[in-house]
């Protein structure tokens, strides 16, 4: 890789990382807006992970990404002391704890939707009167229902009330947001498997044992997992959820860079072993 191509590659890579940091703010703004409807009595400490699962998840994933970038690209093997290596492992372990916790936040959102019940005695939204009702536009988006806009949300005749909330949605909308919640859960679960494999890859590469059958199984598994993640991104794109679509593709690019780092790291180790063997044979 020439110097110019090297600079362009790194500029593109760190631009992707910076955009992912921006997404932390975008998801927080989305979660904050939804929390005013989801938690009408205020967000209690126990509600934080459910109400802000996206923002917490994205923030910790960015930290985890930077940890992998440090070990696989920025820090040279010769300059990584045992203390630095242990520190990176501990930081990543803490990130994994929070990521698993966030996964249960996505699961809680899905289970919450299962509690939606038919709103009896209501055949159109305008009949709800002047009470503080909101329409569930998306998984994390609510719109206040007023006399001026009540007829614009849905022409359905059957509506569902979300458990414990003055928020309603029609049958088609409930199906859509439930499917989106399923995709969130599947996406989060698959990413957990991806990062588990990547952690194993890094640990084996540290010991120069990332080769043979283990290497082939890792590559095959990640091919399947990344394909599922790509399908999730496409689904969000089809459903018009731009932020999730955009975020999903950025993460695929970001971890493609980490995979390239691991490949180059392995190649450097092989070249070093070959050079050492050649020197010893002279």
Identify the residue ranges that each predicted region occupies:
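N-terminal membrane topogenic signal
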Residues: 1-15
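Juxtamembrane membrane-water interface segments of multi-pass membrane proteins
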Residues: 2, 70-86, 111, 198-214, ...
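Transmembrane alpha-helical segments of multi-pass membrane proteins
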Residues: 13, 83-99, 213-229
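C-terminal transmembrane-bundle signature of multipass membrane proteins
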Residues: 17-25, 190-207, 223-278
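Membrane-helix interface motif
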Residues: 24-39, 107-122, 151-165
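Membrane-interface segments at the starts/ends of alpha-helical transmembrane spans
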Residues: 39-53, 127-137, 154-183
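Membrane-helix interface and helix-disruption motif detector
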Residues: 45-56, 111-114, 178-186, 236-247
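Central hydrophobic cores of alpha-helical transmembrane segments in multi-pass inner-membrane proteins
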Residues: 58-74
């Amino acid at each position: 890789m020439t110097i110019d191509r090297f600079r362009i590659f790194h500029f593109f890579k760190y631009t992707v990382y910076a955009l992912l940091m921006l997404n932390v703010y975008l998801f927080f703004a989305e979660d904050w807006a939804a929390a005013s409807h989801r938690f009408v009595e205020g967000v209690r400490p126990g509600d934080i992970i459910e109400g802000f699962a996206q923002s917490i998840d994205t923030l910790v994933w960015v930290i985890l990404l930077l940890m992998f970038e440090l070990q696989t690209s920025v820090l040279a093997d010769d300059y990584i002391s045992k203390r630095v290596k242990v520190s990176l492992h501990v930081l990543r372990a803490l990130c994994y704890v929070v990521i698993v916790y966030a996964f249960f936040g996505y699961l809680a959102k899905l289970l919450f939707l299962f509690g939606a019940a038919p709103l009896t005695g209501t055949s159109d939204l305008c009949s709800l009167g002047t009470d503080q009702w909101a329409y569930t536009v998306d998984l994390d988006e609510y719109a206040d229902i007023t006399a001026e806009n009540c007829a614009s949300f849905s022409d359905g005749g059957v509506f569902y009330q979300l458990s414990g909330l003055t928020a309603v949605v029609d049958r088609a909308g409930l199906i859509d947001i439930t499917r989106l919640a399923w995709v969130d859960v599947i996406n989060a679960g698959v990413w957990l498997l991806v990062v588990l494999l990547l952690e194993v890859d890094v640990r084996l590469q540290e010991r120069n044992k990332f080769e043979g059958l283990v290497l082939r199984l890792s590559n095959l598994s990640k091919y399947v997992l990344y394909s599922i993640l790509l399908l999730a991104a496409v689904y969000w794109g089809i459903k018009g959820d731009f932020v999730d679509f955009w975020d999903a593709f950025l993460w695929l690019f970001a971890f493609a860079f980490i995979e390239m780092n691991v490949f180059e790291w392995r190649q450097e180790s092989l070249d070093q072993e070959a050079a050492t063997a050649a020197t010893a044979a002279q």
